[in-house]
């Protein structure tokens, strides 16, 4: 079989359908493919996202994929100090990713894109030294898909970006290992997400409880992937220490989480890479849905312009714009992550005691200069040359 489109998008997670929808809306022929039998499965996500993304990226606020509205967060230090951020208005939601991802593909289809599940991209097709399409397998049948532009939105292990010669390598230290139970659990405020920090609790990461119902939540952990012990070991240890029986497990999810190593070259000739495939993830908390939406929006803008003007060199503006905007922000967040890796449990106790909720949000988003300057004046920071040195790395 042979097919021809203006654009083929490989991967129907978050970034892929955003690109497919936006380009199809502009009147171009688009094919969105995903290797899974059912788009959205298996879940590899804690499912929390800011309320702001729905308006910003023109996504309907549909109760079919929203499990619970969230009003803030609660952070716990190694010694049990707490920092609560509670808002009067909804600040975020816990999604049902299996439904959300499928609905994003649905919106792309409604905009005019063709969407095919169980279609796996295997390689690129080259003609006279140029990439002109991809080789794929659709329901076990070989197919050649020719396209003017190819979008690699196929996740952390992106086949298409690698086959196209885009350097997506990142060392193991730039990944976290994630392990998560969806389980019955009680005793936590279901209107907040809950995060526990500590070098013995979750090395370089945190434990999370993200409520999906009054007594049901995603309970998971992310730790450095080069740790000799597994994420499951630390999660089960935390559950046992907190007397939470792991006997009502509805689902188990595992995954590799990029927390750095952003891909430098986001467009090469007629190939564009977005989302997890480009490591476009917040290095502090490992969340990448909003980042994928932003990257997909920027990429689709330049894809449309390149097609309209029949000038593929315009795709390079995607790389330029992303690095000048979200890339610049995420590089600042990465600096924070590098510093937090050096914090002791005593440091974590101190900062959770003296930071406000607004301060914590600014640090996680990369807008931290004023917060750091204020911390540098705190007596317990001034008394420690090591803490002073660490914080000054962020300025």
UniProtKB/Swiss-Prot annotation:
List of residues binding a 2,3-bis-O-(geranylgeranyl)-sn-glycerol 1-phospholipid:
329
Q: Which InterPro entries match?
A: DGGGPL_reductase, FAD/NAD-bd_sf, Geranylgeranyl_Rdtase_fam, Geranylgeranyl_reductase, GGR_cat
Taxonomy, superkingdom: Archaea
Q: Which residues cross the membrane?
A: none
Note whether Lipid biosynthesis occurs among the keywords.
yes
Note how many cofactor molecules are bound and how: Binds 1 FAD per subunit.
Q: Where does FAD bind?
A: 15, 34, 45-46, 48, 97, 121, 276, 288
One Pfam family matching this protein: GGR_cat
Q: In which pathway does it act?
A: Membrane lipid metabolism; glycerophospholipid metabolism
What does the record give as cofactor?
Answer: FAD
Q: What is a GO molecular function of this protein?
A: geranylgeranyl reductase activity
Enzyme Commission no: 1.3.-.-
Q: Which reaction does it catalyse?
A: a 2,3-bis-O-phytanyl-sn-glycerol 1-phospholipid + 8 A = a 2,3-bis-O-(geranylgeranyl)-sn-glycerol 1-phospholipid + 8 AH2; 2,3-bis-O-(phytanyl)-sn-glycerol 1-phosphate + 8 A = 2,3-bis-O-(geranylgeranyl)-sn-glycerol 1-phosphate + 8 AH2; CDP-2,3-bis-O-(geranylgeranyl)-sn-glycerol + 8 AH2 = CDP-2,3-bis-O-(phytanyl)-sn-glycerol + 8 A; archaetidylserine + 8 AH2 = 2,3-bis-O-phytanyl-sn-glycero-3-phospho-L-serine + 8 A
Q: What class of enzyme is it?
A: oxidoreductase
Q: Name one GO cellular component term.
A: membrane
Query: What additional remark is attached to this entry?
Result: Reduction reaction proceeds via syn addition of hydrogen for double bonds.
- Which HAMAP family does UniProt cross-reference here? DGGGPL_reductase
Q: What PANTHER family does this protein map onto?
A: DIGERANYLGERANYLGLYCEROPHOSPHOLIPID REDUCTASE, GERANYLGERANYL DIPHOSPHATE REDUCTASE
Its annotated function is as follows: Is involved in the reduction of 2,3-digeranylgeranylglycerophospholipids (unsaturated archaeols) into 2,3-diphytanylglycerophospholipids (saturated archaeols) in the biosynthesis of archaeal membrane lipids. Catalyzes the formation of archaetidic acid (2,3-di-O-phytanyl-sn-glyceryl phosphate) from 2,3-di-O-geranylgeranylglyceryl phosphate (DGGGP) via the hydrogenation of each double bond of the isoprenoid chains.
The Swiss-Prot or TrEMBL record describes its family as follows:
Belongs to the geranylgeranyl reductase family. DGGGPL reductase subfamily.
Name of protein = Digeranylgeranylglycerophospholipid reductase
Q: Which organism is it from?
A: Thermococcus kodakarensis (strain ATCC BAA-918 / JCM 12380 / KOD1) (Pyrococcus kodakaraensis (strain KOD1))
């Amino acid at each position: 079989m042979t097919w021809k489109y203006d654009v083929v998008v490989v991967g129907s997670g978050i970034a892929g359908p955003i690109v497919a929808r936006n380009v199809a809306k502009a009147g171009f022929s688009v094919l969105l493919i995903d290797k899974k039998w059912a788009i959205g499965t298996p879940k590899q996500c804690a499912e929390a996202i800011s309320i702001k993304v729905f308006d910003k990226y023109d996504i309907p606020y549909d109760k079919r994929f929203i499990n619970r509205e969230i009003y803030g967060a609660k952070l716990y230090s190694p010694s049990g100090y707490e920092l609560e951020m509670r808002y009067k208005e909804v600040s975020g939601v816990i999604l049902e990713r299996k439904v959300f991802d499928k609905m994003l593909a649905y919106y792309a289809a409604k905009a005019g894109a063709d969407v095919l599940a169980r279609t796996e991209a295997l390689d690129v097709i080259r003609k006279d030294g140029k990439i002109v399409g991809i080789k794929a397998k659709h329901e076990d049948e070989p197919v050649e898909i020719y396209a003017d532009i190819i979008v690699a939105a196929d996740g952390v292990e992106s086949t298409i970006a690698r086959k196209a010669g885009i350097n997506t390598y990142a060392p193991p230290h730039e990944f976290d290992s994630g392990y998560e139970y969806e389980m019955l659990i009680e005793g936590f405020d279901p209107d907040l997400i809950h995060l526990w920090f500590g070098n013995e609790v979750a090395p370089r990461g945190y434990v999370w409880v993200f409520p999906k119902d009054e007594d049901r939540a995603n309970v998971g952990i992310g730790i450095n992937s080069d740790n000799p012990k597994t994420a499951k070991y630390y999660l089960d240890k935390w559950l046992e220490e907190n007397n939470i029986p792991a006997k009502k497990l509805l689902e188990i999810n595992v995954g590799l989480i990029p927390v750095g190593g952003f891909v430098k070259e986001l467009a090469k000739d007629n190939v564009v890479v977005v989302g997890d495939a480009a490591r476009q993830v917040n290095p502090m908390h490992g969340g990448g849905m909003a980042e994928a939406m932003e990257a997909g929006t920027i990429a689709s803008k330049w894809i449309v312009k390149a097609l309209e003007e029949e000038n593929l060199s315009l795709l390079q503006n995607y790389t330029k714009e992303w690095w000048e905007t979200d890339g610049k922000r995420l590089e600042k967040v990465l600096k924070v992550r590098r510093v937090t890796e050096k914090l002791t449990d005593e440091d974590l106790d101190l900062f959770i005691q003296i930071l406000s909720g607004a301060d914590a949000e600014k640090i996680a988003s990369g807008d931290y200069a004023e917060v750091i300057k204020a911390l540098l004046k705190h007596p317990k920071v001034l008394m420690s040359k090591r803490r002073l040195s660490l914080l000054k790395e962020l300025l």
